A protein has these predicted regions:
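Amphipathic alpha-helical segments
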Residues: 11, 15-18
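A translation/RNA-centric and nucleic-acid-associated enzymatic feature enriched
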Residues: 14, 24, 30-64, 71-100, ...
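Catalytic palm subdomain of template-directed nucleic-acid polymerases
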Residues: 100-107
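Short amphipathic C-terminal alpha-helix that caps PH/PH-like domains
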Residues: 108-118
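Intrinsic disorder/low-complexity segments
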Residues: 119-142
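Short, conserved secondary-structure transition motifs
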Residues: 130, 139-158, 276
């Protein structure tokens, strides 16, 4: 345990140095919140006395963007009920970072640079801060981009844009798309989701340019390393009315599933009109440590004492 925790501490220091050197400001927001974002199948643990433990600091960090901050990051605990396994833990550590005036392509570049800085590639340092703390060293990593529409056409045999089916989309993601991503190996960005799977992401407009998509898609990507999902990124939706509609639709879906009915965070919704353009990402620290230390179980990279 001592060896892994020392490596983890060095990795987290490396993450902080990367963002500090880029001019980001580290922030802290509340772990207990009153109004989680309503998302299907993501349940926040309730707190005695009221409120919930956060599944993500996303809404609170976007409020900071609306208050005038430009580049921010946060490392801290997050919680999800009912998630436990070799890659899941009810409590986990996340880093989220956000940029005003950016898109998901800017965050994509951030992530590539961060992974190289931390050691996934020939530029890796096999000692960190003078300590003998080896991390995984591989040849220069290959990063691939796979678009969701192409992935479903090629590996699932149907087009979610022409025949949307939420259950089928989720099932095929787990049984066909993610295994295909694992077979590619290395880093894979799964990009450009159907509008129905936009979550809190901005929708693109269909283009008439011959080299650009002629259909609308959510400016969203998820990143996998050797098949392990590591990060989820959006060009942020900054349209107040559209976000309210999506939240209300998600609340209705949660009611049908008999899941907790979270109150809406109107302070967040109203703040969107003061952001205009932004992008951000959530990345699992525990899973990143698993990758860099070649560890198979998430429980082995956390201090369970």
């Amino acid at each position: 345990m001592k060896d892994i925790l020392e490596k983890r501490a060095a990795i987290v220091r490396g993450i902080r140095k990367f963002f500090d050197d880029q001019g980001f400001v580290e922030v802290e927001t509340a772990v207990r919140i009153d109004a989680p974002a309503p998302e299907e199948h993501i349940d926040c643990p309730p707190v005695v006395g009221g409120g919930y433990l956060r599944a993500s600091p996303e809404l609170q960090m976007k409020k900071l963007l609306a208050a005038g901050m430009d580049k921010i990051y946060q490392i801290g605990p997050c919680f999800r009920e009912g998630e436990r396994g070799s890659r899941h833990n009810p409590e986990f550590t996340m880093i989220e970072w956000y940029r005003r005036g950016a898109t998901y392509l800017d965050i994509k570049r951030d992530l590539k640079e961060l992974l190289l800085e931390l050691g996934v590639g020939e530029r890796c340092r096999c000692t960190m801060e003078g300590k003998n703390l080896p991390v995984l060293c591989t040849p220069t990593p290959k990063f691939y981009t796979l678009r969701v529409r192409d992935a479903y056409r090629d590996h699932a045999g149907w087009d979610p844009w022409t025949e949307w089916d939420q259950d089928r989309f989720d099932f095929d993601m787990a049984t066909k798309i993610e295994p295909a991503i694992k077979s590619i190996g290395g880093g894979v960005f799964l990009m450009d989701y159907p509008p129905q799977a936009a979550s809190l992401a901005k929708l693109s407009r269909p283009s008439k340019h011959p080299n650009l998509p002629d259909f609308s898609y959510a400016e969203r990507w998820e990143f996998y390393w050797d098949g392990l999902e590591l990060a989820n990124c959006f060009t942020e939706l900054c349209d107040r009315d559209e976000q309210l509609k999506r939240f209300e639709k998600a609340k209705d879906a949660r009611k049908l599933l008999k899941e907790s009915d979270y109150p809406l965070d109107y302070e967040f919704i109203d703040s969107l009109s003061r952001i205009e353009h932004a992008a951000g990402v959530a990345l699992g620290i525990d899973r990143l440590v698993m990758i860099l230390t070649q560890t198979k179980e998430i429980s082995a990279v956390r201090a369970h004492i």
